[in-house]
Amino acid sequence: MAVQKEATLVRQIIRAAGGHAADVRELVAEHGPEAVTAVLVDEIVSRAPHPVNDVPVLVELAVRSGDALVPRRLAVAQGAPVRRAAPDDDGFVAMRVEYELDELVRELFGPCRERAAGTRGTTLFPYATSGTGHIDTYFLAAQQATATVLAGCTSAKPDLNELTSRYLTPKWGSLHWFTPHYDRHFREYRNEEVRVLEIGIGGYQHPEWGGGSLRMWKHFFHRGLIYGLDIEDKSHAEEQRITTVVGDQNDPGCLTELAARYGPFDIVIDDGSHINEHVRTSFHALFPHVRPGGLYVIEDLWTAYWPGFGGDSDPGKSDLTSLGLVKSLVDSLQHQELPEDSGRSPGYADRHVVGLHVYHNLAFIEKGVNSEGGIPGWIPRDFDALVAASSGGAA
Ligand SMILES: C[S@@+](CC[C@H](N)C(=O)[O-])C[C@H]1O[C@@H](n2cnc3c(N)ncnc32)[C@H](O)[C@@H]1O
C-alpha cells in the first residue's frame, strides 16, 4: 500500500471549530493567523463555484485577528477557477470582504449555521481606480465576483447534482442517478468530523483523470477527511482534506493496513473495479472498520449479472456476486429469528448489519449492533396456536 501525504493543521482547525470559541483562539495563538488563514483560503478557493464575471477583478479577503490583519487577494474571472492572486497582480480590486478569523474558522469548519447576515464587513471600491470603463460593467463584475467568493465562504448544504457537474463525477446525469439517494442517507453526517473512504478514485490508467467524487465529498462533508483508494497512482487528486492511497481492493491485507492507519471510517463507498469477487472481498475486509452508526455503500450492482465481471445472468445463481452478498445481508439482518436448530452461528455481518437500503444499482448497508433479540421462544411458532394463545380462551 503506497500512501500519499496527510493533513494535520486542518484537522486541528476542524476540531477547534466544533468546540468553544476559546478553542479557536488557542489554536490561532499557537499557529499564528497567517498559517490558519492559509488553510482557510485553500478551502474557500476549493469551495467557490466557477466565476461568471467576464471582466476580471480581484476580491480582497481581509482576515482580522486582534491587531493583526491578513489580507489575501483572490483573482476571479470567467473561464478559470478562483485562484490566489500573484503578489504583483495589479488588477482592479473591486471589493474587500473582512472577517474575524475565529468567525471564518467556524463558518467554514464548524457545524453548519444557516445565518447569513452579520458575519462580515464589506467595502465596495470605486470603479474609477480601474482607470477606464463604465460604472455598470465594473459594478456587475464586482457583484458577481464577490458572490462567487462568498459562496466559497460558507458550509451551507450544497446541491449534490450541481457538484457532480462542477467536479466531474458520473454519479448523476448520465449512467447513474445516485445523488438523491446519497443526499438522503449522507445529509445527517454533514456536521460531523467524518472520515469517508471511497474505493475507486476514477480515470483508470489515465495519469491525470479522476478525483471528482473525492472533491464532491470534500465539499459536501465540510468537516470531513476524505480518503481515496485506487489501484493506480492518483496522487494528482490530493489536496487539503483529500488523501489518496495506491492499493488493490481485492487484497485484504492492504485494506486492513489502510483501515488501521486511517479508520475507523464513518462511510465507505465501493466504486472500484465492480468485479464481483473484489466487491465481496472489500466488504468483508472493511465493514468491520466502519464505526457503529456508519454506512457501507456499494455502487454499480449491475455487474452482478455479467460474467465479464465475475457475475451470473441467472439471479438464482448469485452465491458469488455482489447482489448475492446484498441478498445474504437480508438474512443477516433477520438471523435472530431463525430456528435454534438452523445450525447457523452468527457471523460478523449477522451481528452488525442493522439496516439495508437497496436502490437501482446502489446499496446502503447500515452498521450497528444487531442484537435486539428474536421473538421469544415461548411465543407460538404456529399461526393457529398463536391465535388461540392471543384470544383469551375465546378461540
Ligand atoms: C468508476 S472509477 C471511479 C469513479 C469515481 N469514484 C467517481 O465517482 O468519480 C473506478 C476506479 O477504480 C479503480 N480500480 C480498478 N480496479 C481496482 C482495484 N482492484 N482496486 C482499487 N481500485 C481499482 C480504477 O483504476 C478506476 O480509477
Curated annotation (Swiss-Prot):
pH dependence: Optimum pH is 7.8-8.5.
Catalytic activity: demethylmacrocin + S-adenosyl-L-methionine = macrocin + S-adenosyl-L-homocysteine + H(+)
Pfam families hit by this protein: MycE_N (PF17843)
Known EC number: 2.1.1.102
Root EC class: transferase
GO biological process, one term: methylation
Keywords: Antibiotic biosynthesis, Methyltransferase, S-adenosyl-L-methionine, Transferase
Pathway(s) per entry: Antibiotic biosynthesis; tylosin biosynthesis
Top-rank taxon, per record: Bacteria
InterPro entries reported in the protein's UniProt record: MycE_N, SAM-dependent_MTases_sf
GO MF annotation list: demethylmacrocin O-methyltransferase activity
Keyword S-adenosyl-L-methionine annotated: yes
Gene3D superfamilies hit by this protein: 3.30.1050.30, Vaccinia Virus protein VP39 (3.40.50.150)
Function: O-methyltransferase that catalyzes the conversion of demethylmacrocin to macrocin, the penultimate step of tylosin antibiotic biosynthesis. Also able to mediate the conversion of demethyllactenocin to lactenocin.
UniProt-recorded name of the protein: Demethylmacrocin O-methyltransferase
Organism of derivation: Streptomyces fradiae
